[in-house]
Amino acid sequence: MPAIAEPYRIKMVEPITMTTREQREAAIRAAGYNTFLLRSDDVYIDLLTDSGTSAMSDRQWSAMMMGDEAYAGARSFDHLVESVRENYGFPLVCPTHQGRGAEHLISKILITPGQHVPGNMYFTTTRVHQELAGGTFHDVIIDEAHDPASRHPFKGNVDLDKFQALIDEVGADQIAYINVAVTVNMAGGQPVSMANIRAVREICDRYGIILWSDATRLAENAWFIQEREDGYAGRPVAEIVREMLSHFDGITMSGKKDCLVNIGGFLAMRDEAILTKARELVVVYEGMPTYGGLAGRDLDAMAVGLREALDDDYLTHRIGQVRYLGERLQAAGVPIVEPIGGHAVFIDAAAFLDHLSQDELPAQTLAAEIFLDSGVRSMERGIVSAGRDADGNNRYPKLELVRLTIPRRVYTNSHMDVVADSVIRVFQRRREIQGLTFVYESPTLRFFTSRFEPLAAEAALEEGRPEPALAGA
């Protein structure tokens, strides 16, 4: 992809400061080697997540000043509904404070205890909400998604044979719905093809199964369809999004990604009965159905942002920046998930630290080491994120990854160069790195709040020796 300048001018800046090695060592120890527990003031370049970390436009800020803060019936809600109808094609909208709130509502509405929920790879919070509602998640993604080196252009696709086999095994009436994520975060930001979405729709129609989507990164998915799928080259992303969403009964949306806001989410659907149930629940858990736990200004910012995220020039630059970082790492021999995804570069931590077993938490270890080297914050997406099963045993995912997640409209390629240089330095001394172990394990979504220590420190403590120096010190 040729070099592309940012398709915007920068009107406001926020200073960031590089820290010393000593400061970073103290910070990561205080955080229990968990990058989620680091203070933002201790972070130089923050690639923890793209959720709620985007820079908003002047038009979004302008819309915020016009927000209607009425407790009920605010016109800001009408603006959001109008934008969703125009750009996504769904007539019915129920706002929530963020995507997690929408996941909670739809799980309670659609799942009867004992039912099954197939999907194209798990996502952490989605699966927890499904399980809390009494459902059982089944991964029906294609096998290529579990291979970091596979170059399949649509690694997010549903394996139609796996989906059919589950229907045959449990019966269509025992499937609450199928949840298709676009793109698939845990697979490396991988897209789903339009042909695959249509094929899943045909199966759902045959058996009367609800087809839902986690559409959080729908604009990026549409851009990949434009780039890779026959018949879509040259078509505007906005048009592809409308076609893509026309196949779904409804969507769960975190506005903090492809709506370019710092907070907010919603459910969008066609079925009045689902909307009625959502409104009954939202007043219990979120707020009135016309604000869903959000200020009116946030609804207005989201209404504008979801339009802006469908701009072709913006998306070409956004995905191009992610590729710039990924290609720098590839050129240095750093193992990453291929093809490079839409919102992040995913380092294959199992291959990067191939001398560590999965029980030695290679992805958690690598995220801590990158921070120690440069102050760059990344995120573990491996055994720690996968958690434990109903019997209390560790889940062992096939992918053990570190996610370098690029916030939208925030950093330049100079920042990406700093990140790449840091990862490459760590890669060059990877044999010195020892794993981590839990010292506190949170019982739910453990990757957020668990704490760790180096295995070498644990061994030294058991033997009464001083704690060894950190790698690279």
From Swiss-Prot:
KW Calcium (keyword) present: no
Enzyme Commission no: 4.1.99.2
Catalyzed chemical reaction(s): L-tyrosine + H2O = phenol + pyruvate + NH4(+)
Cysteines joined through disulfide linkages: none
UniProt GO BP: tyrosine metabolic process
Keyword Calcium belongs to the record: no
Modified residues (N6-(pyridoxal phosphate)lysine): 257
Alphabetized UniProt keyword annotations: Lyase, Pyridoxal phosphate
GO MF annotations, alphabetized: tyrosine phenol-lyase activity
Enzyme superclass (EC): lyase
Superkingdom of origin: Bacteria
Cofactor(s) recorded in Swiss-Prot or TrEMBL: pyridoxal 5'-phosphate
NCBIfam families referenced in this protein's UniProt entry, alphabetically: PRK13238.1, tyr_phenol_ly
Family: Belongs to the beta-eliminating lyase family.
Full protein name: Tyrosine phenol-lyase
